[in-house]
Amino acid sequence: MTPSETKLLSFLVSGELPAAAKAVLKRSIQEFVLQCGWWYQPIELPKQIALGTPQECHTNAIDLTLADETLIYCEGYALFKDSSQPRIHAWVTDGKGNAIDNTWPQPGVVYAGVPFTLDFVTVTTLKNHAAISLLDDFQNGFPLLGDLGDRPVEWLELRGRGTKKLM
């Protein structure tokens, strides 16, 4: 495991829900990613994919999946550089475990996340009238952190598995 992977994994493991939140939610975002997530291999942006709008990772990743059905929307945590802190981020994968990120000007150093079906991404985006984080969906009461997170048949895209499971 690389130092960046160790840093990200330590962050994920430390993400236990506060006591007050446990009355409402089953898991934290970090716990969800740990339970359902995969490691992804960062690659250079393919020539046919344009750089997206800075700080609009969810929109950029959704646009890529809508434009190319072979790409799968992923959301989780990533580190832009070894020295940066983990942040919620969205990217696409090619079904081979690669992280394709058209938001950052260069690939991040490590990606850990969950692949979602295009149907789930589209329905959630339409419901919210915006491309926001599926994991941090406060507008709808964090559904993936509650009962919906226990029903992966409704959201998990198996074609988008990464290089190896996080746990």
Each language-model region and where it sits:
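A structural boundary/capping signal
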Residues: M1-M167
